[in-house]
């Protein structure tokens, strides 16, 4: 059984604000998230997840509850294999996609994650969008190096 206070918080939020949660997200919570949390064969690497949250919030900014909710699923495993090896996140213009993904993938590239030479791929609608995301990550890394 997976226990994560950030997931519980988001599930409670969704139940208390049903008009703010779209139909597809409600279906995802009902048919994927809640059954997954009840499984005994899924391991949640809470230590690495907590390190991720701490790393992101100390090197970038305070994360929103929905970010912590989604990030948690990157640390769930069945037989040492990620339950969700790929994530597809669909967000509109100006919603902060770079701010969502850059801290997480940057964490994956640190020794705190524990995987040497971790490979990250970012897919976008255009080469310029991918370059923008890379530039955000690169510029932030320069800031941290100079500190």
Predicted feature locations:
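Phosphate/NTP-binding elements of NTP-utilizing enzymes
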Residues: 1-146
